[in-house]
């Protein structure tokens, strides 16, 4: 069964090695890991970014589920491309799962990023220098990510991983793969292609 593996690993210098290792974890659970880079881009004269976008969506449509690496990327939240992919698969009605190699909650990560440019309002909530409230529901990331994963029957696994291993530690990923394999084995065939 095909499972789309979303995440910013595609930006790593050793992306191919990480992809191979993740595929091996999936194979041990009877799944085939699919990455955005697997499908050749259409040669139709469109700009490269648009061809990548189209190839990524085609890959997702071919998969029964998604596992998203939601480890904070260039800020306190997940990679926006990965977030889009998670929402796309959720919109297709496919099971979605997530993991993060940072255990700190979204609210505390956001406050750490804002530093002294955040303060408490009179009602006790935090706000930033633009007067915007800081989301703090004690969740792993934005409520729409945690909520979408939960609504899809998925899990959101976390691990407190040292910074040096942030993009290579696969313990939380492996737990997601095991959960996805159990979920996909126990659902009717028509549900995985909805």
Q: PLM ranges: what are they?
A:
Residues 1-194:
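Conserved catalytic or regulatory cores that recognize and/or transform ribose-phosphate-containing ligands
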């Amino acid at each position: 069964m095909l499972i789309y593996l979303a995440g910013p690993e595609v930006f790593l210098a050793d992306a191919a090695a990480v992809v191979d290792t993740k595929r091996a974890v999936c194979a041990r659970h009877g799944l085939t890991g699919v990455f955005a880079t697997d499908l050749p881009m259409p040669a139709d004269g469109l700009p490269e970014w648009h061809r990548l976008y189209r190839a990524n969506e085609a890959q997702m449509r071919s998969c029964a589920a998604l596992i998203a690496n939601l480890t904070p990327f260039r800020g306190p939240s997940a990679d926006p491309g990965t977030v889009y992919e998670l929402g796309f698969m959720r919109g297709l009605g496919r099971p979605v799962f997530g993991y993060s190699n940072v255990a700190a909650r979204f609210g505390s990560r956001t406050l750490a990023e804002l530093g002294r440019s955040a303060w408490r309002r009179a009602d006790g909530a935090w706000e930033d220098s633009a007067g915007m409230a800081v989301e703090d529901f004690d969740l792993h990331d934005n409520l729409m990510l945690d909520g979408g994963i939960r609504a899809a029957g998925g899990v959101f696994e976390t691990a407190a991983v040292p910074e040096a291993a942030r993009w290579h530690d696969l313990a939380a990923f492996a737990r997601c793969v095991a959960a996805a394999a159990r979920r996909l084995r126990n659902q009717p065939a028509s549900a995985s292609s909805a």
